[in-house]
């Protein structure tokens, strides 16, 4: 469950390390984002020679949350940390590698690229 001011780690090699949610996209008064939702983020910490610089604003898709996601069979998949993958204006990933597992809920037309790059799909 991600809301405004939430900090997330970045699960791709775009150059950003930590980002902060500045808006949950998808509705005028939408408060929370879960796995698979697109948010607007600001880069708070970045590595020296990466594509993303501190202060840059990007779209991002949430790939892991502490809250987790409930499956139809009743099981819940939770993670230790909140994480997102940075996206460009066309909602394509900026990085070329994805770190850590992602969930099956990302297997939509939009985010198949992220699923194919991920080392593990839960």
From Swiss-Prot:
Keyword Mitochondrion (UniProt): no
One Gene Ontology term of the molecular function aspect: structural constituent of ribosome
Keyword Ribosomal protein: yes
Keywords: Ribonucleoprotein, Ribosomal protein, RNA-binding, rRNA-binding
InterPro entries: Ribosomal_uL14, Ribosomal_uL14_bac-type, Ribosomal_uL14_CS, Ribosomal_uL14_sf
CDD domains per UniProt: Ribosomal_uL14 (cd00337)
A Gene Ontology cellular-component term: cytosolic large ribosomal subunit
Highest rank taxon of the organism: Bacteria
Subunit structure: Part of the 50S ribosomal subunit. Forms a cluster with proteins L3 and L19. In the 70S ribosome, L14 and L19 interact and together make contacts with the 16S rRNA in bridges B5 and B8.
Recorded family membership: Belongs to the universal ribosomal protein uL14 family.
Function, in words: Binds to 23S rRNA. Forms part of two intersubunit bridges in the 70S ribosome.
Protein name according to UniProt: Large ribosomal subunit protein uL14
Species this chain originates from: Shewanella loihica (strain ATCC BAA-1088 / PV-4)
